[in-house]
């Protein structure tokens, strides 16, 4: 994705109204709400690549005694906080949401790559599969390894029908601040918030 396109999309996302951020107090929140919008990039800017090469998210070695996060519950659409972002994406020609879902969980240990499948978190999301993981160490990280298959990829990507595109990335995140994960074929807007406001988050 070109710098110009990325800048325009970030402006769109960050310009959407979000609830005011809470003060980040003690870094000991145990349950987090995670909300994701996965959207298709219809513009196809970025140029042809070898789409058979699957990227791998960088990170530390697997810990000796990894802790796996616990799935708490699915969050209903009535409690979504990124609806304004979703609406703005729907009103563009180039970025169309393909899945919007949220859930609550505790964090896995840093480097464990222990997460939950899209099927568990989102149910039926045509063409979309993979895993999403939340890790806690010195900082909080949200990572994902997502596959998106479409019968009509954007022509600019020079990809055959049915090509499987892979987005694999892990990054440090801040609670209450939207994060953006991009790929020439599709992208993700993510928001992590503490489920219990009284405990804060890191």
Task: Give residue spans per PLM region.
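C-terminal partner/receptor-binding element of secreted or periplasmic proteins
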Residues: 166-202
């Amino acid at each position: 994705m070109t710098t110009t396109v990325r800048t325009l999309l970030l402006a769109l996302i960050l310009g959407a109204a979000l609830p005011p951020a809470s003060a980040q107090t003690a870094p000991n929140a145990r349950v987090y709400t995670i909300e994701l919008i996965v959207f298709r990039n219809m513009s196809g800017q970025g140029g042809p690549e070898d789409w058979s090469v699957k990227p791998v998210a960088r990170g530390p070695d697997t810990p000796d005694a990894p802790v796996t996060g616990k799935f708490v519950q699915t969050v209903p659409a009535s409690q979504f906080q990124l609806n304004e972002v979703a609406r703005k994406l729907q009103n563009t020609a180039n970025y169309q949401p393909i899945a919007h879902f949220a859930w609550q969980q505790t964090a896995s240990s840093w480097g464990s790559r222990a997460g939950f499948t899209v099927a568990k978190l989102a149910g039926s999301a045509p063409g979309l599969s993979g895993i999403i993981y939340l890790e806690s160490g010195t900082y909080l990280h949200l990572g994902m390894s997502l596959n998106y298959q479409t019968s009509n990829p954007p022509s600019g990507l020079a990809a055959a029908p049915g090509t499987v595109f892979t987005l694999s990335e892990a990054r440090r995140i801040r609670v209450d601040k939207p994060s953006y994960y991009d790929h020439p074929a599709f992208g993700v807007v993510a928001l992590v918030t503490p489920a219990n406001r009284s405990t804060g988050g890191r």
